[in-house]
Amino acid sequence: MDYEKLRELRNKQNRFGDLAGVRIVEIREGYARTELEVKPEFLNPIGSVHGGCLFTMADITGGSAAVSHGEQVTTADADIRYLRPGINVKKLTAESREIKKGKNLLVYQVEVRDEKETLLAVATLSYMSLHQKI
């Protein structure tokens, strides 16, 4: 599979990710990495990166890793733990790790960190294969 082409396709087709500012910077088999430049609009009332922003990054990162196997997927389940507030953060990075690749279900752990490598959130996400080639 041409992972660079897949990365470009995912960035082009994911309109919500584009709106949210999430860029997929790397995809390889069972792995993806995304980045986000934090804007004031992404902060909650206490000045921390909004949890929905962290969740969006985790879902896009996990989903991008899941499609690395060549089939379309949809999110089946997600669980996230917010570990630290993202205060005075300029950039976020999320990385996925494949936990299970089954015939129908794929499971990933995603870590979201700030530019100082501080771990802000950890998510476990399951994706259902739609058994449709990309």
What residue ranges belong to the model's regions?
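Terminal targeting signals and extreme-terminal segments of soluble enzymes
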Residues: 1-134
